[in-house]
Each structure stands twice: as C-alpha cells, then as structure tokens.
Amino acid sequence: MDINLIKQYINSSLPNDKESLIQYYGQLKQILNALSDKEQQQLLNNNGKISEQQQLSIENNYKVIGSIEEKMKSIEHLFNNLDVSDSNNNNSTSPVFISLDNQNTVNNNNNNNNNNNNNNNNNNNNNNNSLAPTVILDNNDNKKTAEIILPDHHNNTPQQQPEQQVQQQQVQQQQQVQQQQQQPEQQQQHLTEEQIQKQQQSQASIQQAIANMGEKKRSSSRHSGPPEIPPEEIKFDVKTDLLGGGAYGKVYKATCRGKKVAVKVPKKQTLSESELKSFKNEVEIMKQIFHPNVVLCLGACTKPGKVMIVSELMQTDLEKLIHSSEVEPPPLYERMKMCLDAALGINWLHGICNIIHRDLKLANLMISKDKTVKIGDFGFSQVIKTGTTLSDQKGPKGTALYMAPEVMMKHEFNEKADVYSFGLILYEMATCEELFPEYSEIDPFYDAICNKKLRPPIPDSFPKSLKTLIQKCWDHDPNKRPSFNEVTQRMNEVLTDTAISGLDAAMFWKYNFIKPESESVPWNEFVYKLSSVVNLPTQVLSPLAQLFVSQSYEEEIGGVVTMERFDLMNKWFGNFFNSKYGPAILYEMIELLKKRWFHFDISRDISEKRLRGRPENTFLLRLSANDPIKTPFTISKTKGSKPTHKRVSREDVQINEIKQFPMGYKFTVPLDGNELVFGSITQMVEELHRIGNLSIPCPITEIKVPYLTD
C-alpha cells in the first residue's frame, strides 16, 4: 500500500453528506486493518528481527495507524452522540459504528472466516463456471471491439455477519458510549494540551460536516453487502431513457428518490446463487471506493426480474467523446488532463483498495458535467492482495482490444494488466484513432499481440514524455511497466509538454513547478521564479499579473497562473525567456498594460459591442486566439459606423535585422493595399494614430444603441 497516498486521504477534507462520510469511515477501517496485517506479517516473516530501515518503515506506518485511529474515534464519538439523541426520541437503538476494540475482535473472526471460505469460493467458482468463455466481436459503424465474457467472474465475495454477532456488537458499543459520556474528565486528564487542541480541531471539522447533512436521519443499522433499493423507487422509461448498452446489459437514465441516477440493467435477470454473488460483489466493490475519479455507487436491487445497479449519473464516456462523427474532440492538452483523471482513479483502486479493474477502456471512463473523468463498470474487477497474482483458468475476461498479453495467454497477472490497458487508452486519446482497425478476428489479433508483440505506431510529433510513457505502459513484460503511482507522476510531465509549446517555456515550468496537481501556480511564486530567470525585479514584473493570472482564479489571493494561460502569453508575445530579446518583450508587455486602447483577449463579439455608437476610427487592440503565433493581435475600429477588424501578423527577423527589430520580431499590418512593418506593437499604434488611420481609443464600456429590431 502507498503510504503517501494514504496520508493524503487521511488529511483530505471530510465529505459533506452522511452516506459519503460513512463510506469514508469504512475506507479508513479497511486501510487500518491492512496496515496492521502488514506489520504483523513483516514481523512474522523476519522472526521478530528487523533492519534499521524496516524499523523506520514500521514506525512510520504506526504513526499513520495512530492518525487513522484518532480520526475514526472522533467520527465514532460524534455519530454515537447523534444516535443516542435520536434513540431517546424514537425509543429505539441503532448505533452506527462499532468501537475499535470490539471491531478488532470482529475483524479477527471475520479474517478467519474469510480464510476458511476462500477455498470454498474457489471450488464454487470451478463448479459453477461450467460454461465456456464467449468471444464477442462488436462490429459497429463507429467502433469495432472484441469482448471475452464469462458468466461468473468474481473470486472474492463479502462474508455476511451473523445477526447475533451484530446485536452483541451493538450492546458493546452502547456500553462504550455510556462510559465515554460518564468519564470525559478522566480522559481529558491523560491528554496533553496540544493533543486536546488537536482533538477539538478535528471534532470541530467533523461537526461542520455533520451540520451539512440535514435534519432527516437515515437508518443507521449496519449490514454487509450492497444497500437494497426497492424496484418501485427506480423509475425510468426503457424506450426514451436508454443511455447505452453492451454484452452485459443496458444503462438507463432514471430517477431514484428524487435524484437523477444511472441504472445498469443486466440482460440476464434470473440469477443463480453464484451469479447473484458475483452481482453483489460488483456492487460491494463499487461501494468500497470513495474517490472523485471513481463513479459513485448508490445501491442495487436484487429482486428477481428487477436486478439493477444504481450509480451517479454521468454525462457521457470517452469513447463517445473521442470517436464522435458529429463533434470535434477536445484539444490534446484537455484530452491528457482526462487521462490524468483516469490515472488518479486507477491509482486509488490499486494503492488503497487493492482492486484490479480488468476492463479499462474508453467506454468505461465516464465524464461528468464538469468534465471530470471517473472510472466505471466494475463487472470484471477483483480484489487482490499486495504482491500476489491472479489467473483465469477457464479463459480471459475483459475487452480483447485492451487486454494485456499475459491475460490473453492465461498466464498469471497482477495490477500491471491495468497499466497495459491504460497505455492503449493513452494512445487512443492522443491520436483519436480506433485501436487495431485491421483486426476483426480474435486469432490473428492474439498472434499479433502475444507472439509478434505488435503495438500501434506512435507518431513522431508526440512529445517525448508522452511517447515514452505509452511505450512503458504497454511493454510486453509486466515487470517493466510502471506502477500507477509512477504513471500519475509522469502524466504531470506529459501535461506540461502538451500545454506549453515553447521549449524554453516548458523547461521553465518543469524545472520550477512540476509536481502533483501542478496545472497552476500562485502568482507570487510564479513572478518570483520568473524574476530570477529573466533578471528583472519582481516590482517591475508585478503589473504582468493582469495578463498572466487566469480570470477564473482571480478570486484567490494574489491570483493563479495556469499552464494554459502561461502558454498563451508565450505564444502571443514571443519567447520572453530568450536572453537577447526577453527583456525587450517583457517591457513591451508592461507598456501595453498602460494603454487605454489595449483590451486584452476579448472576443470579436465583445469588441463590436464596445465599438457600437462610437465616432469614426475609434479603435482598440486585442489579443487573437485564432492563431496566437502568426497573427497574435487584431486591430478593431469603427469605419462607416460599422466595426472592422485587421489582423497583425508577426514573423521572426533575420540576424542582420536585429538592430532594427530589438524584440526579435517584426509586425506587419495591411493598409490601403500596402503592408506596413514595425518593430513593436506600441510603435505600430503610434504611427497609425499619427497618420490618422486610428483616432480615439475605445473605452471598455458599452453604449446602448437601439436597433430597428430591438
């Protein structure tokens, strides 16, 4: 397990609703159990003898364990008080959480039961999976896929707790609540002042989260397995609400308890005992995961003929977005951001939940309304212990086009199979091309991937960081593939290379700011680094915040510079990192900010609204987004009572022209059939104003001019 990832999770802010907070608590409990088992196993393996490095690792883990226990106990205490208050009003008892001391006993018992039942589950799988694997070749007009499906595809099933044991836990927990209420002063005496302050801060944050949950309290009785939702509460029309479908079944847009949701309906509605276990296991796996890049499972219905999984409603998936014939795909940088979202979600599955997805593909990467990518469809997912492997004895499961060769060859595999799939996803997202269009049969495809080790050709135009990551991910040897923790780190470099086109600018960002979540940097930090590179004081550069700070982040203290905005500045104004021309370019930028006629990067439509009703030759200069390198500026002015627009082109100068053009560029503007050339934008505007082509600088306000159609 990734300790750094766990620390981030522990220090993350609490969910704002009760259901998510309960899931968060359950995730903490799983991490706690896994860490405790890991330390005990390490001591057993070494017969109690450990090295200094192992000792440091164990001490670090115990610190993390302590942090988890402290946060869990605070949540328990507050929820217990909430439940006791409700039970007094309702004459019922329904404790939410089981105390840690009692839970350890329960966990030990459950671990023994799970160990005893593992062999039984494996035997049941072998007995029930008598059907041969099915290969499905889906030859649609838009997409050609091959899926390999087995009826029973889960090895791990959660164990049910006996009712008597749950009742005993509830009694024990109530006793603990009473003791906590009766002896608060004694507990306080054993805490230092710093510990008391820390506990109060933790409880205050949790109280704030609980305050947002609403007055209506849901039933808090504990049960294992997915939450059962009555079928009559899931409402949708099979004709009008269809979102998509595949070999497994169909997905519909629905309403459940007033909330818009997605409902996955399997084709097979009458399930055998083993199939029902598999279905519940899929839901249970989804229920264990709480992460912004994983689709949230809300519950399920297991009633025969009404079998369904209910999850949060997403807008679309990456396959529809990338391969749509009606809409152009997003720019490369945005597509790579989507890949980073997916990598973060998978890293969480591997690092915290020990879950292998096993069916990663564009169709299973969902997109929310805010363009966040989330991992979905856990039909083939399996829980795997760290350092162990799995194997498909009766045939591989998943989608063949994205399937790792070791899985296809029925060899042992681990989480690196997901890494292989991600390599193909990364390639597909970068090229917007379908995978392996030349193959329609499984046998030649198997030979190409497994024996000949063929992979799609990577275009030379790709940034080196992207090419290298793709090649590492789809390496034939699983041991040479990176972990998803490494993938997420490398994706930050890929984002920089795809967001920032200039070599010097990209190197500046990588050297100074590349780190996890490094898509933006505070202005104060940015200008300090820029000052040290271009050898200009921060006081001189400070006005540039008006250009560099992204408008969507202005509300933050000092503002934020995003990679996209930084790249645009480098395209619009040129390479201000150049040792010869850089200072002149930066001073030109600062001078432009003083001019009333400079209107930043407003759109053509806004410029025309500002010019409406103005006198002849009223003008403004704006930055152009159409081609920011070749035609970075546009002059908009009134002519004959109508707005007109002229683009200003820019090109590099020759070595013998440097004295005439100190910024390293020359700017050209058409005028009366001729082309006028200037060494700077300010020089150009001053000359056009002198000869009468431009007159009054346009203010940033608009004049309300009535039209006949108004």
UniProtKB/Swiss-Prot annotation:
InterPro entries: Kinase-like_dom_sf, Prot_kinase_dom, Protein_kinase_ATP_BS, Ser-Thr/Tyr_kinase_cat_dom, Ser/Thr_kinase_AS, Ser/Thr_Kinases-Pseudokinases, SH2, SH2_dom_sf. Residues 237-495 form the Protein kinase domain. It comes from the Eukaryota. Residues 83-136, 189-232 are annotated as: Disordered. Its EC number is 2.7.11.1. GO terms for molecular function: ATP binding; protein serine kinase activity; protein serine/threonine kinase activity; protein tyrosine kinase activity. The active site is at 359 (proton acceptor). GO terms for cellular component: cytoplasm; membrane. Residues 597-707 form the SH2 domain. Pfam families: PK_Tyr_Ser-Thr, SH2. Belongs to the protein kinase superfamily. Ser/Thr protein kinase family. SH2 domain-containing protein kinase subfamily. PANTHER family: DUAL SPECIFICITY PROTEIN KINASE SHKE, SERINE/THREONINE-PROTEIN KINASE TNNI3K-RELATED. Required for proper chemotaxis and phagocytosis; proper spatiotemporal control of F-actin levels in chemotaxing cells. Negative regulator of the PI3K (phosphatidylinositol 3 kinase) pathway. Predominantly phosphorylates serines and threonines and tyrosines at a lower level. This is Dual specificity protein kinase shkE.
